[in-house]
Amino acid sequence: SAQTAACRTETGIAYRDATGDGYVDSLCRLDICWPADRKGFPTVVWFHGGGLTGGRREIPKALCVKGFAVVGVDYRLAPRVKVADCVADAAAAAAWVVKNIASYGGDPRLIFIAGHSAGGYLTSMIGLDKRWMAPYGIDPDTAFAALIPYSGQVVTHFARRREMGIPDTQVVVDDMAPLNYIR
């Protein structure tokens, strides 16, 4: 369609430097779809759901044809890695967007972090707990226009509770719970 033709797409962009670890190098990638005929557009960084144990990056194309850039992010998955590694990957991807979106024509002041379910959890963690963006010199309070976590857990994620040998049904609020960082 004419609307879709106005979008450009680039896929498989590494947001972490190559490590030589095939798992890291294959999963720490993102796709970007952006308006080809505009500058200064807002950007949505989209983290997929899947319980932090499954899922693949995706781009909700409806946003791109409405004038947004959309960045679909893959991240490493539990139980192969710890939940903290999933969050660290989300932070690295968001930092890549902050540092690179202007080169695509996007407005770096209009970066929205969003995701569904596990992606909502990642959204909340990197946007509320400042330690995740700090290694990149980024303050989420000023770098992100908004956080949009759809159905994300605000207590400690069940995948983290599994790591700790705690039943999924037992609520835990520790340093990996977005609830601790709401301000």
Label the model's feature ranges.
Residues 56-73:
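Short amphipathic alpha-helix adjacent to the substrate-entry channel of hydrolases
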Residues 29, 42, 65, 85, ...:
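Extracytoplasmic/secreted proteins, especially bacterial periplasmic and envelope-associated proteins
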Residues 68, 75-77, 152:
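Active-site loop/turn elements of alpha/beta-hydrolase fold enzymes
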Residues 40-49:
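Short beta-strand element of the alpha/beta-hydrolase
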Residues 92-162, 173-174:
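Primarily recognizes the serine-hydrolase "nucleophile elbow" in alpha/beta-hydrolase
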Residues 54-57, 80-81:
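Short N-terminal helix/helix-N-cap motif within the alpha/beta-hydrolase-1
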Residues 171-183:
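Serine-hydrolase catalytic core
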Residues 2-38:
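N-terminal cap/lid segment of alpha/beta-hydrolase-fold proteins
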